[in-house]
From Swiss-Prot:
Residues 226-241 have a biased composition (Polar residues). Keywords: ANK repeat, GTPase activation, Metal-binding, Repeat, Zinc, Zinc-finger. InterPro entries: Ankyrin_rpt, Ankyrin_rpt-contain_sf, Arf-GAP_GTPase_ANK_PH, ARFGAP/RecO, ArfGAP_dom, ArfGAP_dom_sf, PH-like_dom_sf, PH_domain. SUPFAM superfamilies: Ankyrin repeat, ArfGap/RecO-like zinc finger, PH domain-like. This is Arf-GAP with GTPase, ANK repeat and PH domain-containing protein 5. Belongs to the centaurin gamma-like family. One of its GO terms (molecular function) is GTPase activity. Residues 282-443 form the PH domain. The keyword Ion transport does not apply. SMART domains: ANK, ArfGap, PH.
């Protein structure tokens, strides 16, 4: 087996070899020479080189000797080549003990140690270590390592001592030369920290090969960076070799964009945070609700709903759409109302006891039932109510109750145009919270809104005069339901003016009973202005309060609950509605006669009492005309509009196949034509 001699040298310490220490590495078959390198290179240390332990393993008769620089024979003083590709070749000489060297003058030459009698090169081993030269000032940040492989045949030769001495002396010389002229290149040098305090090499003077205690240290290599700080570091060259395996070097050319721009990534969230939610109203309530689609499937889908202080309810397909402010739909609450299926509003659910005639502001009306009992028309019925008012349970009662339970968490928003949005919450507490928030916002938005269209902005002077004429009608100086002055809101189908507080209650009734509009905020086409100018508060109250004797209307000091109870009893329950005139005609036939005579007051009374079937009654089998046909034949847009609001069929044809639009064209009434086309009457001229 072979033997290994390993030496680690630091320029600032002396070199000594301890006697008979080492480790065997039979796989190594070449000489490694390592030059100085700087720590900044960061190359990993080779596994074969262990700087913390300097070993010498030789044969039994082999001894190591050290020669001081002062004692170095003149025959050993040589200079290294300045060529970076230079190598040191050691060859054995079996014929002579003298070590002779012959450095070439050519820069491409190498330092050659060869024997006197043998000229052929038996074996060449070149080092494959990279020289890393620091660009900073040198301050003892490098070391040099050399490993000498000794096989059995070499260890038995007597000239081995001179070979080891030459190699040992060559190590610091190479370090000195390399640092001095920056020309010696030792590729792929593995840099490591120096951990050996001193290394001693002893030499026996007698040549017998015995070791003694005479030792000295090799002088430290001077720091060339301090001597010549202005030198430039040339790029080092790599010496290829098939023996040693190079370490893989990774390029920084293809670094990820994410890692190459840390500042941009750090600043990106700050810039993004500055733009979130800019220009949008802050929601006062928001969350996920189920919304029923308007298609025939009637499917429920999750929507992210927001309620803002500007009086707008907005729903999005998802929370992400809300964050991006896309795919949204808005509901203007100023022209809408909210309803809960199967439930009265909370303001109208107070109990009502039997009210005597002495009650100044009662809403119940004493009616003869044949038993002398009084009926309370409040949602809750007193315990003193006659048993006649408690009908036997219906066989469908349980079914209706079950249907109500299924929709306990639902609520709907109805616009002035009749459009409906159905929403559902997860719990009834959440539903009530949404209903209360929307109701409060409707009232707040109506109270805080200012007129966006002044009288000077009207399209013509005639429109301003028409709106002024509406306010100048009898009874329109105060609210139709109680004595609030200067009302600014109107109910189209009732033809009345009201205050803003009553307008909120009228919205809760639904568009079937009251269609609320603002005199200042909404547009007023000709047909609507004519309806309002034809009815007024006095005419309307003569019909809707025709039987309110003994009942006192709410005052300005009345609570909202009292006002709402009065309004619902007046329009929804029709407790104070004037009675029908005594006639042998049915209500439908009476309506046809009133329409033909253009008796507006009688027509309004009949419409208030009538049902949808009675409103659509025809003159007879031979004619087949409805009240709408008669109104359009007269060109009376007020009656035509009222009939449409109360449920007349605009698609109906008479016995001759004519629609109401045909009669409107015959009467040359453009106003009736516009109304009929607006509500979907078929146009046969198209």
């Amino acid at each position: 087996m072979g033997n290994i001699l390993t030496c680690c040298v630091h320029p600032s310490v002396s070199l000594e070899f301890d006697q008979q220490q080492g480790s065997v590495c039979p796989s190594e078959s070449e000489i490694y020479e390592a030059g100085a390198g700087d720590r900044m290179a960061g190359a990993p240390m080779a596994a074969a080189v262990q700087p913390a332990e300097v070993t010498v393993e030789v044969g039994e008769d082999l001894h190591m000797h050290h020669i001081r620089d002062q004692e170095m024979p003149e025959a050993l003083e040589f200079s290294l080549s300045a060529n970076p590709e230079a190598s040191t070749i050691f060859q054995r000489n079996s014929q002579t003990d003298a070590l002779e060297f012959n450095p070439s003058a050519n820069p491409e030459a190498s330092t050659i140690f060869q024997r006197n009698s043998q000229t052929d090169v038996v074996e060449i081993r070149r080092s494959n270590c990279t020289n890393h030269v620091s660009t900073e000032r040198f301050s003892q940040q490098y070391s040099s390592c050399s490993t000498i492989f000794l096989d059995d045949s070499t260890a038995s030769q007597h000239y081995l001592t001179m070979t080891i001495i030459s190699v040992t002396l060559e190590i610091p010389h190479h370090i000195t030369q390399r640092d001095a002229d920056r020309s010696l290149s030792i590729p792929d040098e593995q840099l490591h920290s120096f951990a050996v305090s001193t290394v001693h090499i002893t030499k026996n003077r007698n040549g017998g090969g015995s070791l003694n205690n005479y030792s000295s240290s090799i002088p430290s290599t001077p720091s060339t960076s301090q001597e010549d700080p202005q030198f430039s570091v040339p790029p080092t060259a790599n010496t290829p070799t098939p023996v040693c395996k190079r370490s893989m070097r990774w390029s920084n050319l293809f670094t990820s964009e994410k890692g190459s721009h840390p500042d941009k990534e750090r600043k990106a969230p700050e810039n993004h945070a500055d733009t979130i939610g800019s220009g949008r109203a802050i929601p006062i309530k928001q969350g996920m609700l189920l919304k029923r689609s308007g298609k025939w499937l009637k499917t429920w889908k999750k929507k992210y709903v927001t309620l803002c202080s500007n009086g707008v309810l907005t729903y999005y397909s998802s929370l992400g759409d809300y964050m991006k402010n896309i795919h949204k739909k808005e509901i203007d609450l100023r022209t809408s109302t909210i309803k809960v299926p199967g439930k009265w509003p909370s303001l109208a659910t107070s109990a009502c006891a039997p009210i005597s005639s002495s009650k100044s502001n009662g809403l119940s009306k004493d009616m003869d039932t044949g038993l002398g009992d009084s009926i309370c028309f409040s949602p809750s019925i007193s315990s003193t109510t006659s048993p006649k008012l408690n009908p036997p349970p219906s066989p469908h009662a349980n079914k209706k109750k079950h249907l109500k339970k299924k929709s306990t968490n639902n609520f709907m928003i109805v616009s002035a145009t009749g459009q409906t949005w159905h929403f559902e919450a997860t719990t009834y507490e959440e539903r009530d919270a949404w209903v209360q928030a929307i109701q409060s916002q409707i009232l707040a938005s109506l109270q805080s809104c200012e007129s966006s269209k002044s009288k000077s902005q009207l399209t013509s002077q005639s429109e301003a005069m028409a709106l002024q004429s509406i306010q100048n009608m009898r009874g329109n100086a105060h609210c139709v339901d109680y004595e609030t002055q200067n009302p600014k809101w109107a109910s189209l189908n009732l033809g009345v003016l009201m205050c803003i507080e009553c307008s909120g209650i009228h919205r809760s009734l639904g568009t079937r009973l009251s269609r609320v509009r603002s005199l200042e905020l909404d547009d007023w086409p000709v047909e609507l202005r004519k309806v309002m100018s034809s009815i007024g508060n006095d005419l309307a109250n003569s019909i809707w309060e025709g039987s309110s004797q003994g009942q006192t209307k709410p005052s300005v000091k009345s609570t909202r609950e009292e006002k709402e109870r009065w309004i619902r009893s007046k329009y929804e329950e029709k407790l104070f509605l004037a009675p029908l005139p005594c006639t042998e005609l049915s209500l439908g036939q009476h309506l046809l006669r009133a329409t033909a005579d253009e008796d507006l007051q009688t027509a309004i009374l009949l419409l208030a009492h009538g049902s949808r079937e009675e409103v659509n009654e025809t003159c007879g089998e031979g004619d087949g005309c409805t009240a709408l046909h008669l109104a359009c034949r007269k060109g009376n847009v007020v009656l035509a509009q009222l009939l449409i609001w109360y449920g007349v069929d605009v698609m109906a044809r008479d016995a001759h196949g004519n629609t109401a639009l045909t009669y409107a064209r015959q009467a040359s009434s453009q106003e009736c034509i516009n109304v009929l086309l607006q509500y979907g009457c078929p146009d046969e001229c198209v």
